[in-house]
Structure formats: C-alpha cells, structure tokens
Regions:
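Transmembrane alpha-helices and adjacent helix-loop boundaries
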Residues: 1-249
Length: 249
C-alpha cells in the first residue's frame, strides 16, 4: 500500500474498533453509553506516558493503554451501574467530563495544552506510518475476532437474551448485571486501544481533542447505519462513515 493509503486507512481501523466495542455494549448488553470518550482520552494519554516515561515499545504501550482503560472501567462500573436507562447514559457523559477535568489538573499531563509523543523521534516518516498502520490493522482484526468468539460462547448467548429481553433473561438464570459489566469493561478497553492509536497517529493529545463527545457521535452513527446488534454491522458502518468523510472532506 502507498503511504497515503496507509494514512487514510488507520482512521478506518480505529473506527472499526470503536464501532465494534460500542455495539458489543449497546447492541448486546443494552448499555447506551455517550461517555466512551473517557477511555479514548485515557488511552491516548496513557500510551504517551507508557512509551515516553516508562519506555515501552509503541505496540506494547498501545496494548497496555487498552488494558489500563479496562482496569479503570471496573471501579467506574460500580458507580455507573447504580443508574439505569437514560440516567446511565448521562452518567457516562459526566464520568467523561470528570476524566477530562482530572487530566487537565494532574501535574505532568500538560494541562490544557496536552502532551506530545516523543518515542517516535529518530524514526523516519514512512516507517512510523507503516508501524501504526499494521498495528491498527492487527488490533482491528483481533477486536472483531474476539467479539465473534465471545458472541458464540455461553456468555454471548446470555448477551443475546439480554438484548431481546433482560427481564426474561434474568428469570432464566442469566447473570444480567455481571454480563453487562463484562461488556462495559471490554468496550472501555477497546475505546482505550482506539484512543492510543489516535494518539500515536497524531503524535499529540490534548483534553479538548481526546475527550471530545464527537467520538460518541461517530460510534452511534457507525453502529446505527451498519446494524445494531450484529457482528458485521459496525464494520459496514465504519466503511460507510469513512467513505463519506473522505468524499465530503
């Protein structure tokens, strides 16, 4: 592939990850979140700290940032799951704003101006673009495959039942809350991976860009247009969204 094609495709892979993980949470778990930008931002800032401060290689730092975001989602879920329906959705947005404010105030995170990634210094542009491209491609494939395997498992059958009727699923012995927490944590980890890819692609992060609610708008559009509650829906939606963005840009 040409360098120009790689540059464009990296965004597509990040969109596939975001759409697939949001669909897992909303399309199967029945959890409509409008605050996943909390973990996109955390993943973006996390990968820079892990690469520049800790010294991890970029691919390892990206994966580690996703794991950190999944870990952050566990305690956060115990707060959010006290809310239901629209209150849950608004609660996730509040959490995202809290993440943003905390990031701005923490020392060493650049305040309102953000941080720059220095781990790629000395690496030529073509190599950097190719590295991020193949990393994004690999992660997008792994996320889709992991979602497919999950939905073919016992947990996936329970999630399908929850999607159709959570009350009936609970009456049949499905652990509704535990299953929902699982997909929330998984989706947050996926958002962290996408945020880390966005950060290493742009080489810079700031609170306003990384914690922007536009990412949630992108995810909702991708899933709705592609097909909510299907494996292939987010992929189709991401391709349509990406094509429209390229044509209208």
């Amino acid at each position: 592939l040409s360098t120009r094609a790689m540059l464009a495709s990296k965004l597509l892979f990040a969109l596939i990850i975001l759409g697939t993980t949001w669909n897992l949470m909303a399309g199967y778990g029945g959890l409509v979140s409008i605050g996943q930008q909390a973990y996109i931002g955390a993943g973006g800032y996390g990968v820079i700290k892990l690469a520049d401060v800790v010294g991890l290689p970029i691919p390892v730092a990206v994966v580690a940032a996703g794991v950190v975001c999944a870990a952050l989602a566990i305690p956060t879920s115990f707060l959010l799951f006290r809310l239901v329906g629209g209150y849950f959705a608004i609660g996730t947005w509040v959490v995202a704003e809290v993440f943003k404010l905390v990031t701005q105030e923490l020392p060493g995170f650049g305040g309102g101006s953000g941080l720059s990634l220095t781990a790629f210094q000395g690496v030529d542009r073509v190599t950097r673009i190719a590295t991020v491209y193949y990393l994004a491609l690999a992660l997008a494939v792994l996320v889709v495959l992991a979602t497919y395997v999950l939905m073919r498992s016992r947990v996936g059958l329970g999630l399908t039942a929850i999607r159709d009727d959570s009350v009936a699923a609970a009456s049949l012995g499905v652990a509704v809350r535990r299953s929902q927490r699982l997909v929330y944590v998984a989706a947050s980890g996926g958002a962290g991976l996408a945020g880390a890819l966005i950060a290493v692609n742009g080489l810079r992060v700031s609170p306003d860009s990384m914690f922007s609610v536009q990412y949630t708008a992108f995810m909702i559009f991708i899933v709705v247009i592609g097909g909510l509650g299907t494996i292939e829906g987010p992929i189709l939606g991401a391709v349509i969204f990406f094509a429209l963005q390229q044509l209208l840009d």
